[in-house]
A protein has these predicted regions:
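Charged phosphate-binding loop/patch that engages nucleotide di/tri-phosphates or the phosphate backbone
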Residues: 124-141
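Basic, amphipathic alpha-helical patches used to engage nucleic acids or provide basic targeting signals
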Residues: 70-93
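Active-site metal-binding core of divalent-cation-utilizing nuclease and nuclease-like domains
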Residues: 23-58, 72, 140-141
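Nucleic-acid nuclease catalytic cores
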Residues: 85-121, 128-130
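Nuclease catalytic cores
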Residues: 2-11, 15
């Protein structure tokens, strides 16, 4: 129960931060038009969709609380790659971002393995601070 509350807080922090930056959340969950149909998790990790002026983004929110951070990274990279390809087919004008908490950025993404992942997988990242309830850094490739 405590973990679910933490995960919900992470999700809300990202939504609130995007709205504070002028984004309009258009979908709290995103369903891909695929066979079989894929949709994002209803609990911990969610994909949200937002628009600002002419920009459109989809954001896969990760907590990096559930497993080892290396295992979380591997899972996140697999989802990111699949979601990005599906999004290119479904809505090519929408950019996919992976939102990660500050602790995950510092422990994984700012280090060698994370930097390689950012480069090889062409990750677009939003680093968010749960305590301050705001995005700290946008990394665009």
């Amino acid at each position: 129960m405590i973990l679910n509350l933490q995960l919900l807080k992470f999700y809300q922090v990202v939504c609130d931060a995007l709205e504070a930056e002028g984004w309009t959340i258009t979908h709290k969950e995103y369903v891909f038009d695929a066979d079989p149909q894929l949709e994002t998790d209803l609990g911990a990790e969610r994909l949200i969709v937002a628009e600002r002026r002419l920009e459109k983004i989809a954001v896969e929110i990760k907590s990096f609380l559930l497993e080892s951070q290396a295992a979380e990274l591997e899972k996140a990279l697999g989802q990111y790659g699949l979601y990005r390809k599906l999004l290119e087919l479904q809505e090519p004008d929408r950019t996919l971002y992976l939102a990660v908490p500050l602790h995950a950025y510092e422990d994984i993404f700012a280090r060698q393995v994370g930097q390689i992942a950012i480069e090889v997988f062409e990750l677009q990242l939003i680093v968010y601070d749960v305590a301050r309830e705001e995005p700290l850094l946008w990394i665009k490739r």
